[in-house]
Amino acid sequence: ILWVQIPGLYIGYSLGTCGVVLRPFLARSKIDEEVHQRALQAFFSRDLHATKDRTGILVMASLLEHRAEILADTGINAKVPLDTWQGILNDMTGKIKSGDLTEGICTAVRECGEVLAKDFPGTHDNPNEISNKIIIED
């Protein structure tokens, strides 16, 4: 009987922790909170909050949950209205939903850059303190 129970337990556990299986059963608010928590974790674990003027920004797309998030540090939020990011998110998610992930992310990054250039122009005494590379995680 153990030879049936142990594999069954393993399969049940695996399915229960698999996002693809769980996603249809989770409330929208729970999915939003999970994505937001992962964005916060990425923001702080990559030290985006550690710039001199607190001007780090994270643009994140979570493909499994079909959600996106833009997090800006306090230096940016002091000058840029929060609803600015919602407009950019709407553009990005619209492109992603239509099947153009690359264009969605590129558009979001470009639009964020345009917003930031107004209040945070690049200068010689304000070097780029963090990497601008795109990071893809499973």
Each language-model region and where it sits:
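Flexible, solvent-exposed short loops/turns enriched in glycine
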Residues: L64-L101
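C-terminal binding/interaction regions
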Residues: A78-G87, L116-D138
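Membrane-cytosol interface motif
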Residues: F25-S45
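Divalent-metal-activated hydrolytic enzyme cores
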Residues: G19, F25-R28, D32, V109, ...
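Surface-exposed interaction patches
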Residues: L101, I105, E111-K118
